[in-house]
């Protein structure tokens, strides 16, 4: 959604934080699903780092399809910032976005696994 990307860039241009879920929706299971390239694209375009965040124990709080919220122990793990490549001539090849997305997926899996371990979930 081009309009949404423009709004996100405007938020980042103001120096404000932006939260994205690069999988596009809540997922279940032990692995991070394939990511959309939007987070990497925005990081490269705005020249800002991506901070991977992993959540553990949230599947039981509000299971997909549920309208109820259940009290459960959850954990949040914040990873190290991932700095996007900087284009010397103002443009980067499309592969830079793909590579940053792949790096983000690995980092998200690490923090996701740590967050699950903190609440006693097996990985």
Where are these regions (language model features)?
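Non-catalytic C-terminal accessory region of glycerolipid acyltransferases
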Residues: 2-123
